Regions:
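PLP-dependent aminotransferase-like
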Residues: 63-98
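Conserved PLP-binding active-site segment in aminotransferase class I/II-type PLP enzymes
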Residues: 1-64, 68-69, 89-90
Length: 98
């Protein structure tokens, strides 16, 4: 496997993840709502929706932009497969570049 980056995870983050896991609310609930509020404030925007994966985020982004059949989306040739898969999922054409 080619490592693209070394994770830098603080002890505070590890502790918070433990709290969330023990709460049983992994998908919705107070932690997700608080994170969305904090992120919206940090970004200076009104609304934020967090999703479960980068794949879901890419998919929603393309849908929000109205990308679909007849569109071409340029993606890097060296990337996670989802980068191209979501383009195909919305009916657009993937164009690989390097």
């Amino acid at each position: 496997m080619i490592k693209l980056a070394k994770p830098n995870i603080s002890e505070a983050a590890i502790k918070k993840v433990g709290e969330v896991l023990r709460s049983g609310n992994l998908i919705q609930g107070e932690y997700v709502q608080q994170f969305e509020q904090d992120l919206a404030e940090y970004l200076g925007v009104k609304n934020v929706i967090v999703v479960s994966s980068g794949t879901a985020a890419l998919h929603l982004s393309l849908l929000a932009l109205g990308v679909g059949p007849g569109d071409e989306v340029i993606v890097p040739a060296f990337s996670f497969p989802a980068t191209a898969n979501v383009v195909e999922a919305v009916g657009a054409t993937t164009v690989f570049v390097d």
